[in-house]
């Protein structure tokens, strides 16, 4: 068992097992842990091993090769037939041979399942409080504090500080927004972290200066044709239409749709104003985090459950250190080699898959699962699956579902608590408390701001400024790491290129002649089979760009506006949901007589009116495009089958990619076979575009196998979302009949 850990240590002398007295504190999953020594692979025998050269990290489990793994790419330890290869530079990345990992482009991606807007979080918090009050359960109530009356001088000083931090926040937000907007206009892709920062900054700007809605938004709409003309890289390069008018309309439609979606996201990011709020949420969170970090005082279970909801998956994963990311990947049997962005991306996709599975399992019931299904579900969530009884499997899975779905604890916190060195005897609240202690300080700042926004309280400008500056520093650090990787890769490639291009020397002279001094009988021959299939899966960034261009070309040939119509319908649903959430909040507050204290911000009201106007304009553009296409440009056969306008055959995709640029036949077959999940010879273009946009937003390198897994995850989320919509519709109809 010890060899599983010790074989991957960094060669710092012979390792030995430490005595139990030398064990590190429980839950020590920090930068000092040597997480390259952890091997959390299957789940049979559980032991904690400590070597001389590192501190303890993950628990270690044995693994049987006969057990199927639900992982992104099976590690070489799990499959004996997979060839090993060294790291090789490719473009500006370091990649591992085998399934190759490629960066692709895109801007928007599908929203993760269950990702709530700010108003939805406020509504859930309000419903939870009212429900506990009706049931007579425990409701968190802050201790009564003695109000100290401030002197006149102290009040003036506080006001001066408030305006100072407010103007400083406004200036910094303006600079960051201008820089990111310039990057967008010049065709650069914002990462997920940058887009989230840009969205929050725009919401802050409209909150600080509501008058900007009358100036900025109409100015942006007026300049759309100019922007499209001056910055052609803002849109995909393949708008190869025969009609200049149709091309102009499509570009205008695309930009208006993106702008309307962004403005709606900005509206949902703005918090409601609660005039009755006393600013207790920020103080309560600060006191809670001070207890678990400094004083050592144990918070109540209600406090732990209440504040744990604020540490969302995206916030937690974006701020974890690399050792913690590697530990989580090994716990979930994911690839632990790659950039931080790649590790976060595959963790995000796994958490999205687990979230969808949790809802499906909860609907069917844990008791309906077989033993193998229980083991697979527990193993996928980082829990013990082998060597335990069926009752324990059901018990720990039910506890997981209760914490995740009923108490709404983020999946990332639950997974992180299982990656730590914690005994099974600890209660869920104590496990969450120990997990929160390991999170970086920046996560606490973000959660503190979110706590005030959810309660509808006025966010302190100083706290908002600190969170913005910390997030900007993290973004700049990512850029520096990216530039450093690119420079190192270019430095490794440059000597090889210079040697291969020496003037006056033929290529044959570059290699010295080898003298055969070894007898033929002593020459060792490698009899292992050569795995040619791995080479066929190598896909470059250029080939992915060609795939994106081919999709655009095929959609143009089919005159398909399916994606635009679908996005417009989703935008209309978001607007309607926002309006319904506002009404529900007022309805919940009417139970306590506080509905008069809540109101929508001025900037939010103005933006909502502008989005409604843009939706009408987009409807008109789509109608105009359809009319243009029906005037002799659309094939009658295609017009008679609207259901298949987004479905193409594998041969059509291969033919379109060949027309753009020559690609080897085996690569085309490998790529299309990975995209054709059900092997029926057909591919949905819209689903393919969603995958490309999703990966492009993360700026990571993935393999063809992972493309198929992303498609499966998106389909699973769509299935769960359809069930939830049908359930909500049935509940609304039942409520209407009852009333």
Swiss-Prot record:
The keyword Methyltransferase does not apply. Residues 115-135, 445-492, 537-626, 707-738 form a coiled coil. Residues 251-536 form the Letm1 RBD domain. Residues 717-739 are annotated as: Disordered. Residues 1-114 form a transit peptide. Ca(2+) binds at residues 676, 678, 680, 682, 687. PINK1-mediated phosphorylation at Thr-191, positively regulates its mitochondrial calcium transport activity. Residues 229-739 are mitochondrial matrix. Residues 115-207 are mitochondrial intermembrane. GO terms for cellular component: mitochondrial inner membrane; mitochondrion. It catalyses: Ca(2+)(in) + 2 H(+)(out) = Ca(2+)(out) + 2 H(+)(in); K(+)(in) + H(+)(out) = K(+)(out) + H(+)(in). Keywords: Acetylation, Antiport, Calcium, Calcium transport, Coiled coil, Ion transport, Membrane, Metal-binding, Mitochondrion, Mitochondrion inner membrane, Phosphoprotein, Potassium, Potassium transport, Transit peptide, Transmembrane, Transmembrane helix, Transport. The modification Phosphothreonine is found at residue 191. It is found in: Mitochondrion inner membrane. GO terms for molecular function: calcium:proton antiporter activity; metal ion binding; ribosome binding. Belongs to the LETM1 family. Plays an important role in maintenance of mitochondrial morphology and in mediating either calcium or potassium/proton antiport. Mediates proton-dependent calcium efflux from mitochondrion. Also functions as an electroneutral mitochondrial proton/potassium exchanger. Crucial for the maintenance of mitochondrial tubular networks and for the assembly of the supercomplexes of the respiratory chain. Required for the maintenance of the tubular shape and cristae organization. Essential for early embryonic development. This is Mitochondrial proton/calcium exchanger protein. It comes from Rattus norvegicus. The gene is Letm1.
